[in-house]
Amino acid sequence: MHWADVIAADLLKRSNSHRIATGISPSGHIHLGNLREMVTADAIRRALLDAGGEAKIVYIADDFDPLRRRYPFLPEEYENYVGMPLCKIPDPEGCHDSYSEHFLQPFLESLEILGIPVEVRRAYQMYSEGLYENNTRIALKRRDEIARIIAEVTGRELEERWYPFMPLCENCGRINSTRVTSFDENWIYYECDCGHSGRVGYVGGGKLTWRVDWAARWQILSITCEPFGKDHAAAGGSYDTGVRIAREIFDYEPPYPVPYEWIHLKGKGAMKSSKGIVLPVREMVEVIPPEIVRYITIRVKPERHIEFDPGLGLLDLVEEFEEKFKEKDRSVELSLVGEVVYSDVPFRHLIVVGQIANWDLEKALEIIERTGYTVDDVTRRDVERRLKYARKWLEKYAPDNIKFEIPEKVTAEFSEEEKKFLRAYAERLRSDMKPEEIHTLVYDVSKEVGIKSSKAFQAIYKAILGKTYGPRVGYFIKSLGVEWVRERIKAAL
Protein backbone atom coordinates (compact mmCIF):
# COMPACT_ATOMS: atom_id res chain seq x y z
CA MET A 1 0.00 0.00 0.00
CA HIS A 2 1.43 3.38 -0.99
CA TRP A 3 2.37 5.72 1.87
CA ALA A 4 -0.15 8.36 0.67
CA ASP A 5 -2.97 5.79 0.77
CA VAL A 6 -1.95 4.76 4.31
CA ILE A 7 -2.15 8.38 5.48
CA ALA A 8 -5.46 8.89 3.65
CA ALA A 9 -6.92 5.81 5.37
CA ASP A 10 -5.87 7.20 8.78
CA LEU A 11 -7.37 10.60 7.98
CA LEU A 12 -10.67 9.12 6.82
CA LYS A 13 -11.05 7.46 10.23
CA ARG A 14 -11.17 10.98 11.67
CA SER A 15 -13.34 12.71 9.07
CA ASN A 16 -14.43 12.48 5.44
CA SER A 17 -13.40 16.08 4.68
CA HIS A 18 -9.87 17.46 5.07
CA ARG A 19 -7.91 20.67 4.69
CA ILE A 20 -4.18 20.08 4.21
CA ALA A 21 -1.89 22.97 5.10
CA THR A 22 1.41 23.88 3.48
CA GLY A 23 3.52 26.92 4.25
CA ILE A 24 6.68 28.30 2.71
CA SER A 25 8.33 31.64 3.35
CA PRO A 26 9.05 33.45 0.04
CA SER A 27 12.41 34.72 1.30
CA GLY A 28 14.31 33.49 -1.77
CA HIS A 29 14.01 31.10 -4.69
CA ILE A 30 11.43 28.48 -3.76
CA HIS A 31 13.26 25.29 -4.64
CA LEU A 32 12.87 21.57 -5.13
CA GLY A 33 13.47 21.00 -1.41
CA ASN A 34 10.50 23.25 -0.56
CA LEU A 35 8.45 21.54 -3.23
CA ARG A 36 8.58 18.25 -1.32
CA GLU A 37 6.03 19.74 1.08
CA MET A 38 3.63 20.63 -1.74
CA VAL A 39 3.95 17.31 -3.59
CA THR A 40 3.55 15.35 -0.34
CA ALA A 41 0.37 17.30 0.41
CA ASP A 42 -0.98 16.73 -3.10
CA ALA A 43 -0.28 12.99 -3.01
CA ILE A 44 -2.34 12.84 0.20
CA ARG A 45 -5.08 14.99 -1.38
CA ARG A 46 -5.29 12.68 -4.40
CA ALA A 47 -5.29 9.57 -2.19
CA LEU A 48 -8.16 11.02 -0.14
CA LEU A 49 -10.18 11.77 -3.28
CA ASP A 50 -9.49 8.29 -4.67
CA ALA A 51 -10.77 6.80 -1.41
CA GLY A 52 -14.02 8.78 -1.63
CA GLY A 53 -13.08 11.62 0.71
CA GLU A 54 -12.96 15.38 0.20
CA ALA A 55 -9.72 17.33 0.36
CA LYS A 56 -8.23 20.74 -0.34
CA ILE A 57 -4.70 22.12 0.00
CA VAL A 58 -4.23 25.48 1.68
CA TYR A 59 -0.93 27.19 0.88
CA ILE A 60 0.10 29.89 3.35
CA ALA A 61 2.71 32.27 1.98
CA ASP A 62 4.54 33.60 5.03
CA ASP A 63 5.09 37.04 3.53
CA PHE A 64 4.75 38.76 6.92
CA ASP A 65 8.01 37.11 8.05
CA PRO A 66 11.02 39.43 8.31
CA LEU A 67 14.02 39.34 5.99
CA ARG A 68 16.43 37.64 8.39
CA ARG A 69 19.66 38.78 6.72
CA ARG A 70 21.00 39.99 3.40
CA TYR A 71 21.37 36.80 1.40
CA PRO A 72 24.31 36.39 -1.02
CA PHE A 73 22.06 36.94 -4.06
CA LEU A 74 20.88 40.37 -2.82
CA PRO A 75 22.55 43.75 -3.50
CA GLU A 76 24.27 45.56 -0.61
CA GLU A 77 21.46 48.07 -0.14
CA TYR A 78 19.21 45.22 1.04
CA GLU A 79 21.11 45.37 4.33
CA ASN A 80 18.74 48.29 5.04
CA TYR A 81 15.69 46.01 4.72
CA VAL A 82 16.79 43.32 7.18
CA GLY A 83 14.06 42.90 9.80
CA MET A 84 11.27 44.24 7.58
CA PRO A 85 8.37 42.02 6.44
CA LEU A 86 8.99 40.42 3.05
CA CYS A 87 5.78 41.92 1.69
CA LYS A 88 7.00 45.45 2.56
CA ILE A 89 10.37 45.18 0.79
CA PRO A 90 10.83 46.16 -2.88
CA ASP A 91 11.42 43.50 -5.52
CA PRO A 92 15.21 43.23 -6.10
CA GLU A 93 14.62 43.11 -9.87
CA GLY A 94 11.75 45.59 -10.03
CA CYS A 95 9.31 43.28 -11.82
CA HIS A 96 6.80 42.62 -9.01
CA ASP A 97 5.04 44.69 -6.37
CA SER A 98 7.18 43.34 -3.54
CA TYR A 99 10.10 41.10 -2.61
CA SER A 100 7.75 38.29 -1.55
CA GLU A 101 5.72 38.39 -4.78
CA HIS A 102 8.93 38.22 -6.84
CA PHE A 103 9.64 34.74 -5.45
CA LEU A 104 6.04 33.70 -4.89
CA GLN A 105 4.58 34.22 -8.37
CA PRO A 106 6.93 31.87 -10.28
CA PHE A 107 6.29 29.24 -7.60
CA LEU A 108 2.51 29.51 -7.94
CA GLU A 109 2.85 29.21 -11.73
CA SER A 110 4.91 26.06 -11.20
CA LEU A 111 2.24 24.55 -8.94
CA GLU A 112 -0.26 24.95 -11.77
CA ILE A 113 2.09 23.16 -14.20
CA LEU A 114 2.55 20.39 -11.62
CA GLY A 115 -1.19 19.93 -11.23
CA ILE A 116 -1.30 21.04 -7.59
CA PRO A 117 -4.46 23.10 -6.91
CA VAL A 118 -4.12 25.33 -3.86
CA GLU A 119 -6.12 27.86 -1.89
CA VAL A 120 -3.54 30.64 -1.51
CA ARG A 121 -3.44 32.60 1.73
CA ARG A 122 -0.93 35.41 2.26
CA ALA A 123 -0.06 35.84 5.93
CA TYR A 124 -0.01 39.66 5.85
CA GLN A 125 -3.44 39.74 4.23
CA MET A 126 -4.80 37.33 6.85
CA TYR A 127 -3.56 39.56 9.66
CA SER A 128 -4.79 42.72 7.90
CA GLU A 129 -8.25 41.25 7.37
CA GLY A 130 -8.58 40.48 11.08
CA LEU A 131 -8.49 36.69 10.80
CA TYR A 132 -5.92 36.54 13.60
CA GLU A 133 -7.56 39.16 15.83
CA ASN A 134 -9.31 36.79 18.22
CA ASN A 135 -6.30 34.49 18.51
CA THR A 136 -4.02 37.48 19.15
CA ARG A 137 -6.26 38.68 22.00
CA ILE A 138 -6.37 35.18 23.51
CA ALA A 139 -2.59 34.73 23.17
CA LEU A 140 -1.79 38.05 24.87
CA LYS A 141 -4.21 37.43 27.73
CA ARG A 142 -2.86 33.90 28.26
CA ARG A 143 0.80 34.63 27.64
CA ASP A 144 1.90 33.18 30.98
CA GLU A 145 0.27 29.85 30.14
CA ILE A 146 1.88 29.85 26.68
CA ALA A 147 5.29 30.66 28.21
CA ARG A 148 4.83 27.76 30.65
CA ILE A 149 3.94 25.36 27.78
CA ILE A 150 7.00 26.45 25.78
CA ALA A 151 9.24 26.03 28.85
CA GLU A 152 7.83 22.57 29.62
CA VAL A 153 8.14 21.34 26.03
CA THR A 154 11.47 22.91 25.07
CA GLY A 155 13.18 23.27 28.44
CA ARG A 156 13.78 26.93 27.58
CA GLU A 157 12.64 29.56 30.10
CA LEU A 158 11.31 32.76 28.53
CA GLU A 159 12.02 36.14 30.11
CA GLU A 160 9.30 37.67 32.27
CA ARG A 161 8.61 40.46 29.79
CA TRP A 162 8.07 38.00 26.89
CA TYR A 163 4.92 38.41 24.81
CA PRO A 164 3.77 36.11 21.97
CA PHE A 165 3.45 39.04 19.56
CA MET A 166 5.81 40.99 17.26
CA PRO A 167 4.55 44.55 16.59
CA LEU A 168 5.35 46.22 13.27
CA CYS A 169 7.28 49.41 14.07
CA GLU A 170 5.59 52.46 12.57
CA ASN A 171 8.92 54.31 12.48
CA CYS A 172 11.53 51.93 10.99
CA GLY A 173 9.19 49.34 9.47
CA ARG A 174 10.87 46.40 11.20
CA ILE A 175 9.05 43.56 12.90
CA ASN A 176 11.92 41.68 14.56
CA SER A 177 13.31 44.52 16.70
CA THR A 178 10.17 45.40 18.68
CA ARG A 179 8.96 44.33 22.15
CA VAL A 180 5.47 44.52 23.58
CA THR A 181 5.36 46.55 26.80
CA SER A 182 1.62 46.28 27.55
CA PHE A 183 -1.81 45.96 25.95
CA ASP A 184 -5.43 46.87 26.54
CA GLU A 185 -8.66 46.11 24.69
CA ASN A 186 -7.87 48.47 21.81
CA TRP A 187 -4.08 48.71 21.52
CA ILE A 188 -0.84 46.82 21.83
CA TYR A 189 1.97 49.07 23.12
CA TYR A 190 5.60 48.51 22.15
CA GLU A 191 9.10 49.86 22.00
CA CYS A 192 11.63 49.31 19.21
CA ASP A 193 15.41 49.13 19.00
CA CYS A 194 15.27 52.13 16.66
CA GLY A 195 14.25 54.21 19.71
CA HIS A 196 10.59 54.55 18.79
CA SER A 197 7.73 53.77 21.17
CA GLY A 198 4.19 53.45 19.92
CA ARG A 199 1.05 51.40 19.69
CA VAL A 200 -0.56 49.17 17.07
CA GLY A 201 -4.02 47.69 16.65
CA TYR A 202 -5.00 44.03 16.79
CA VAL A 203 -5.66 43.96 13.04
CA GLY A 204 -2.52 44.13 10.88
CA GLY A 205 -0.36 45.77 13.55
CA GLY A 206 2.04 42.85 13.79
CA LYS A 207 2.10 39.09 14.01
CA LEU A 208 2.17 36.30 16.56
CA THR A 209 5.49 34.62 17.26
CA TRP A 210 6.08 31.50 15.14
CA ARG A 211 5.07 28.72 17.55
CA VAL A 212 1.87 30.54 18.49
CA ASP A 213 1.12 31.67 14.93
CA TRP A 214 1.32 28.07 13.67
CA ALA A 215 -1.17 26.78 16.25
CA ALA A 216 -3.48 29.75 15.60
CA ARG A 217 -3.59 29.23 11.83
CA TRP A 218 -4.61 25.59 12.31
CA GLN A 219 -7.75 26.81 14.01
CA ILE A 220 -8.33 29.83 11.75
CA LEU A 221 -8.10 27.75 8.55
CA SER A 222 -9.63 24.52 9.97
CA ILE A 223 -6.50 22.52 9.13
CA THR A 224 -6.68 18.74 9.64
CA CYS A 225 -3.37 17.58 8.14
CA GLU A 226 0.02 19.18 7.52
CA PRO A 227 3.34 17.99 6.10
CA PHE A 228 6.36 19.80 7.57
CA GLY A 229 10.14 19.53 7.67
CA LYS A 230 11.90 17.27 10.14
CA ASP A 231 13.28 20.27 12.08
CA HIS A 232 9.75 21.11 13.27
CA ALA A 233 9.15 17.45 14.17
CA ALA A 234 12.14 17.15 16.52
CA ALA A 235 11.44 16.49 20.20
CA GLY A 236 10.61 19.82 21.80
CA GLY A 237 10.22 21.38 18.37
CA SER A 238 7.54 23.63 16.88
CA TYR A 239 5.01 20.84 16.36
CA ASP A 240 5.21 19.61 19.96
CA THR A 241 4.60 23.11 21.32
CA GLY A 242 1.95 23.73 18.65
CA VAL A 243 0.00 20.65 19.75
CA ARG A 244 -0.28 21.87 23.32
CA ILE A 245 -0.96 25.51 22.40
CA ALA A 246 -3.69 24.42 19.97
CA ARG A 247 -5.39 22.20 22.56
CA GLU A 248 -4.84 24.18 25.76
CA ILE A 249 -5.03 27.77 24.49
CA PHE A 250 -7.11 27.74 21.29
CA ASP A 251 -9.23 24.66 22.08
CA TYR A 252 -8.44 23.06 18.70
CA GLU A 253 -7.37 19.52 17.86
CA PRO A 254 -3.99 19.72 16.07
CA PRO A 255 -3.68 18.40 12.52
CA TYR A 256 -2.39 14.97 11.52
CA PRO A 257 1.39 15.42 11.20
CA VAL A 258 3.40 14.27 8.17
CA PRO A 259 7.08 15.05 8.87
CA TYR A 260 9.40 14.80 5.88
CA GLU A 261 13.15 14.60 5.31
CA TRP A 262 15.25 16.99 3.23
CA ILE A 263 16.10 16.75 -0.44
CA HIS A 264 19.87 16.93 -0.88
CA LEU A 265 21.47 18.20 -4.06
CA LYS A 266 24.13 15.65 -4.91
CA GLY A 267 27.54 16.79 -3.75
CA LYS A 268 26.21 20.00 -2.16
CA GLY A 269 23.93 19.01 0.73
CA ALA A 270 20.43 20.05 1.79
CA MET A 271 18.84 22.70 -0.40
CA LYS A 272 18.71 26.13 1.24
CA SER A 273 17.90 29.43 -0.47
CA SER A 274 19.98 31.35 2.06
CA LYS A 275 23.11 29.36 1.10
CA GLY A 276 22.44 29.40 -2.62
CA ILE A 277 22.02 25.59 -2.73
CA VAL A 278 18.87 25.54 -4.83
CA LEU A 279 17.16 24.18 -7.88
CA PRO A 280 14.35 26.73 -8.36
CA VAL A 281 11.02 25.00 -9.00
CA ARG A 282 10.25 27.29 -11.95
CA GLU A 283 13.48 26.18 -13.61
CA MET A 284 12.81 22.52 -12.86
CA VAL A 285 9.38 22.42 -14.50
CA GLU A 286 10.81 23.91 -17.69
CA VAL A 287 13.57 21.30 -17.93
CA ILE A 288 11.96 18.14 -16.54
CA PRO A 289 8.47 16.70 -17.30
CA PRO A 290 6.05 17.55 -14.44
CA GLU A 291 5.32 13.90 -13.70
CA ILE A 292 9.04 13.28 -13.12
CA VAL A 293 9.34 16.32 -10.82
CA ARG A 294 6.45 14.89 -8.76
CA TYR A 295 7.85 11.35 -8.88
CA ILE A 296 11.09 12.49 -7.20
CA THR A 297 9.07 12.95 -3.98
CA ILE A 298 6.19 10.49 -4.39
CA ARG A 299 8.34 7.40 -5.02
CA VAL A 300 9.76 7.39 -1.46
CA LYS A 301 8.23 7.69 2.01
CA PRO A 302 8.32 11.23 3.46
CA GLU A 303 10.65 10.20 6.29
CA ARG A 304 13.37 9.11 3.85
CA HIS A 305 15.87 11.71 2.66
CA ILE A 306 16.31 12.13 -1.10
CA GLU A 307 19.68 12.52 -2.82
CA PHE A 308 18.90 14.26 -6.10
CA ASP A 309 21.26 14.45 -9.05
CA PRO A 310 19.87 16.54 -11.94
CA GLY A 311 22.57 15.14 -14.23
CA LEU A 312 23.00 11.44 -15.00
CA GLY A 313 21.09 10.52 -11.83
CA LEU A 314 17.96 12.04 -13.34
CA LEU A 315 18.25 9.74 -16.35
CA ASP A 316 18.22 6.73 -14.01
CA LEU A 317 15.13 8.14 -12.30
CA VAL A 318 13.34 8.67 -15.63
CA GLU A 319 14.25 5.14 -16.68
CA GLU A 320 12.74 3.82 -13.44
CA PHE A 321 9.58 5.86 -14.08
CA GLU A 322 9.29 4.49 -17.64
CA GLU A 323 9.40 0.92 -16.32
CA LYS A 324 6.93 1.65 -13.50
CA PHE A 325 4.59 3.35 -16.00
CA LYS A 326 4.17 0.03 -17.80
CA GLU A 327 3.37 -1.67 -14.48
CA LYS A 328 0.71 0.96 -13.61
CA ASP A 329 2.58 1.59 -10.36
CA ARG A 330 0.73 3.66 -7.72
CA SER A 331 3.62 6.13 -7.37
CA VAL A 332 3.39 6.79 -11.11
CA GLU A 333 -0.39 7.15 -10.92
CA LEU A 334 -0.05 9.78 -8.18
CA SER A 335 2.65 11.57 -10.21
CA LEU A 336 0.84 11.96 -13.53
CA VAL A 337 -0.52 15.38 -14.47
CA GLY A 338 -3.46 15.30 -16.88
CA GLU A 339 -3.65 12.90 -19.81
CA VAL A 340 -0.06 11.80 -20.34
CA VAL A 341 0.97 9.15 -22.86
CA TYR A 342 4.25 7.25 -22.85
CA SER A 343 5.56 5.28 -25.81
CA ASP A 344 8.31 2.64 -25.71
CA VAL A 345 10.94 5.22 -26.70
CA PRO A 346 13.26 5.80 -23.71
CA PHE A 347 14.21 9.33 -22.65
CA ARG A 348 17.88 8.37 -23.00
CA HIS A 349 17.26 7.52 -26.67
CA LEU A 350 15.51 10.86 -27.24
CA ILE A 351 18.63 12.66 -26.01
CA VAL A 352 20.76 10.92 -28.66
CA VAL A 353 18.12 11.12 -31.40
CA GLY A 354 17.47 14.81 -30.72
CA GLN A 355 21.12 15.71 -31.18
CA ILE A 356 21.39 13.72 -34.42
CA ALA A 357 18.13 15.23 -35.76
CA ASN A 358 19.10 18.72 -34.59
CA TRP A 359 15.86 18.61 -32.56
CA ASP A 360 13.65 18.45 -35.66
CA LEU A 361 10.55 16.40 -34.79
CA GLU A 362 10.03 14.75 -38.18
CA LYS A 363 13.69 13.81 -38.52
CA ALA A 364 13.64 12.48 -34.96
CA LEU A 365 10.62 10.29 -35.73
CA GLU A 366 12.36 8.92 -38.83
CA ILE A 367 15.38 7.95 -36.74
CA ILE A 368 13.18 6.45 -34.03
CA GLU A 369 11.44 4.28 -36.62
CA ARG A 370 14.80 3.26 -38.08
CA THR A 371 15.96 2.10 -34.65
CA GLY A 372 13.09 -0.37 -34.38
CA TYR A 373 10.28 1.54 -32.68
CA THR A 374 6.73 1.74 -34.00
CA VAL A 375 5.79 5.33 -34.82
CA ASP A 376 2.06 5.65 -34.21
CA ASP A 377 -0.08 8.46 -32.78
CA VAL A 378 0.98 7.67 -29.20
CA THR A 379 4.67 7.73 -30.14
CA ARG A 380 4.28 10.99 -32.05
CA ARG A 381 2.51 12.72 -29.14
CA ASP A 382 5.00 11.37 -26.61
CA VAL A 383 8.09 12.26 -28.65
CA GLU A 384 6.79 15.73 -29.51
CA ARG A 385 6.30 16.48 -25.79
CA ARG A 386 9.39 14.85 -24.30
CA LEU A 387 11.85 15.82 -27.04
CA LYS A 388 11.55 19.43 -25.83
CA TYR A 389 12.44 18.36 -22.28
CA ALA A 390 15.35 16.24 -23.57
CA ARG A 391 16.80 19.29 -25.29
CA LYS A 392 16.42 21.54 -22.26
CA TRP A 393 17.88 18.90 -19.93
CA LEU A 394 20.86 18.49 -22.26
CA GLU A 395 21.49 22.24 -22.30
CA LYS A 396 21.01 22.74 -18.56
CA TYR A 397 22.14 19.67 -16.64
CA ALA A 398 23.82 17.13 -18.93
CA PRO A 399 27.52 16.40 -18.41
CA ASP A 400 29.74 17.16 -21.39
CA ASN A 401 30.30 13.50 -22.25
CA ILE A 402 26.59 13.18 -23.14
CA LYS A 403 26.70 16.08 -25.60
CA PHE A 404 27.99 15.67 -29.12
CA GLU A 405 28.12 17.26 -32.56
CA ILE A 406 28.93 15.36 -35.73
CA PRO A 407 31.71 17.22 -37.58
CA GLU A 408 31.63 17.36 -41.37
CA LYS A 409 35.08 15.80 -41.62
CA VAL A 410 37.07 13.65 -39.24
CA THR A 411 40.68 14.72 -38.67
CA ALA A 412 41.51 12.09 -36.05
CA GLU A 413 44.50 9.82 -36.57
CA PHE A 414 44.24 6.04 -36.26
CA SER A 415 46.78 3.35 -35.38
CA GLU A 416 47.19 0.36 -37.70
CA GLU A 417 45.24 -1.91 -35.35
CA GLU A 418 42.41 0.66 -35.19
CA LYS A 419 42.31 0.85 -38.99
CA LYS A 420 42.25 -2.93 -39.24
CA PHE A 421 39.36 -3.12 -36.77
CA LEU A 422 37.34 -0.33 -38.43
CA ARG A 423 37.66 -1.88 -41.92
CA ALA A 424 36.54 -5.29 -40.63
CA TYR A 425 33.73 -3.76 -38.57
CA ALA A 426 32.41 -1.68 -41.49
CA GLU A 427 32.39 -4.76 -43.74
CA ARG A 428 30.33 -6.75 -41.23
CA LEU A 429 27.78 -4.00 -40.52
CA ARG A 430 24.37 -4.61 -42.13
CA SER A 431 21.32 -2.37 -42.34
CA ASP A 432 18.99 -5.12 -41.08
CA MET A 433 20.92 -5.48 -37.81
CA LYS A 434 19.24 -4.55 -34.52
CA PRO A 435 20.99 -2.08 -32.18
CA GLU A 436 21.98 -4.90 -29.78
CA GLU A 437 23.56 -6.84 -32.67
CA ILE A 438 25.51 -3.78 -33.80
CA HIS A 439 26.81 -3.35 -30.26
CA THR A 440 27.76 -7.03 -29.85
CA LEU A 441 29.56 -6.96 -33.20
CA VAL A 442 32.16 -4.63 -31.69
CA TYR A 443 33.22 -7.37 -29.26
CA ASP A 444 33.19 -10.07 -31.95
CA VAL A 445 35.33 -8.13 -34.45
CA SER A 446 37.73 -6.73 -31.84
CA LYS A 447 38.42 -10.28 -30.66
CA GLU A 448 39.02 -11.47 -34.23
CA VAL A 449 41.50 -8.70 -35.11
CA GLY A 450 43.23 -8.73 -31.71
CA ILE A 451 42.37 -5.27 -30.35
CA LYS A 452 41.02 -4.46 -26.89
CA SER A 453 37.26 -3.85 -26.99
CA SER A 454 37.74 -0.49 -25.20
CA LYS A 455 40.12 0.62 -27.98
CA ALA A 456 37.63 -0.64 -30.58
CA PHE A 457 34.81 1.50 -29.16
CA GLN A 458 37.13 4.52 -29.06
CA ALA A 459 38.02 3.98 -32.72
CA ILE A 460 34.33 4.03 -33.70
CA TYR A 461 33.70 7.27 -31.77
CA LYS A 462 36.81 8.85 -33.32
CA ALA A 463 35.58 7.95 -36.81
CA ILE A 464 32.10 9.39 -36.20
CA LEU A 465 32.60 12.20 -33.67
CA GLY A 466 36.32 12.90 -33.70
CA LYS A 467 36.59 12.08 -29.97
CA THR A 468 37.02 8.92 -27.92
CA TYR A 469 33.57 8.73 -26.29
CA GLY A 470 29.91 9.02 -27.20
CA PRO A 471 26.45 7.42 -26.85
CA ARG A 472 25.91 3.65 -26.66
CA VAL A 473 27.22 2.35 -30.00
CA GLY A 474 24.34 0.10 -31.10
CA TYR A 475 21.56 2.68 -30.93
CA PHE A 476 23.91 5.45 -32.02
CA ILE A 477 24.90 3.73 -35.29
CA LYS A 478 21.33 2.60 -35.95
CA SER A 479 20.14 6.19 -35.34
CA LEU A 480 22.70 7.61 -37.76
CA GLY A 481 21.98 4.93 -40.35
CA VAL A 482 24.24 1.94 -40.99
CA GLU A 483 25.08 2.95 -44.58
CA TRP A 484 26.01 6.45 -43.50
CA VAL A 485 28.29 5.04 -40.77
CA ARG A 486 29.98 2.65 -43.20
CA GLU A 487 30.73 5.53 -45.59
CA ARG A 488 31.89 7.65 -42.67
CA ILE A 489 34.38 5.00 -41.55
CA LYS A 490 35.72 4.64 -45.10
CA ALA A 491 36.14 8.42 -45.39
CA ALA A 492 37.86 8.59 -41.99
CA LEU A 493 40.43 6.00 -43.05
Curated annotation (Swiss-Prot):
GO BP term, pick one: lysyl-tRNA aminoacylation
Gene name for this UniProt entry: lysS
Motif ('KMSKS' region): 270-274
Annotated compartments: Cytoplasm
SUPFAM superfamilies: An anticodon-binding domain of class I aminoacyl-tRNA synthetases, Nucleotidylyl transferase
GO cellular component: cytoplasm
Top-level EC class as recorded in UniProt: ligase
Stored PROSITE patterns: AA_TRNA_LIGASE_I
Molecular function GO terms recorded: ATP binding; lysine-tRNA ligase activity; tRNA binding
Keywords carried by this UniProt record: Aminoacyl-tRNA synthetase, ATP-binding, Cytoplasm, Ligase, Nucleotide-binding, Protein biosynthesis
EC number assigned by the record: 6.1.1.6
Renumbered ranges of motif 'HIGH' region: 26-34
ATP-binding among keywords: yes
Protein name: Lysine--tRNA ligase
Pfam family, any one: tRNA-synt_1f
Reaction it catalyzes: tRNA(Lys) + L-lysine + ATP = L-lysyl-tRNA(Lys) + AMP + diphosphate
Family: Belongs to the class-I aminoacyl-tRNA synthetase family.
